Amino acid sequence: MKAWLRRPTDTGARLPSLAFLSRCALAGLGLLTGCSADFTAADVAYFQPAITASSAPARPLRESWSLHNNTRRVGLAEMRPIIPAFNGQGALLASWNPHPAGVFGRPSFIVIHGGHGLNPTNFATALWLRDEFQANVLVLDSYWSRGREENWATGTRYGVNMRVLDVIAAGRWLRDSAGADPRHSFLIGDSQGGWTVLRSFTTEAFFQRELPGLLRAGIALYPNCKADGTAQYPRLGPYAGPVLIFTGGRDSATPIAQCAPATLNAASEWLHFPGATHGWDVANRGAHTPAVDGECGRAMNVYNQFPVCRSDATTAAMRTRIKSFVQGLSNP
């Protein structure tokens, strides 16, 4: 399948705060060795692009898969605009799947997507979490709600700072409207979603005013971890709560070489699979059908059509560690 060739653009966007821009300009002139600034309230408008959609596409990402077959067909709720945005302007799409015996007193998971947007792998992960932990599961969208399908360019206003604000919005809703216990609420994401996990738990004062009261821990699968201190690639770590990271040695989408050692070593635990590509847990037949082990495909990303090879063994090892991580925090 040929990749969708639309180049992402940012129109009508307010710039990040001067605190970001001035330090980054000096760094570019060689007057500073790094470029960093704290996220502030002045940055919220830039990282809250308008919500423009109230329904999800039936066949997302250039009609490459069926949303119905990966939600309703497998017993997951349809995507609905139920999460009030961080800035209070509109609602994010999400699939909310409370446990039939009640929400409180059991684990809850927020599942967040990568740069291709929600895909069958995210819904397969949601099913596994629901069944393995008898959990409540919220599958959160950040792109469809804003009239787009992907963020392949990565370092844009649709990147990690926007995503963290969406996580805060989802955590608020989960606690205040759904009745979940934040002491047992977990964030899990892959690729750019994994990046979002790392950024969410980074000791950034603006975010940490809220997140400790919303989430217990985070799980990052093959995360993007480029960090140069700019608004688009802000710092990652140290972390304000428990974080579990998984990486792959054959990952050419989010290669481990881009990760500062401190980003990985600051985690509660970091597991590396030397033979794994990006997306080793890919649901290559959809969430409704068992995956084909060993099959390799290519990403639709126009900037990097990296290989994605399913590995049942790596997926099983990862899930075993996730299970012990969650249980260890749920039953101290």
Segments predicted by a language model, with ranges:
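Bacterial signal peptide processing site
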Residues: S36-D38
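Serine-hydrolase catalytic machinery in alpha/beta-hydrolase-like enzymes
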Residues: I83-P100, G105-G179, N284-P307
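Bacterial N-terminal signal peptides
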Residues: S22-T33
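Primarily recognizes the serine-hydrolase "nucleophile elbow" in alpha/beta-hydrolase
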Residues: I168-P238
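C-terminal catalytic histidine-bearing segment of alpha/beta-hydrolase fold enzymes
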Residues: S268-P332
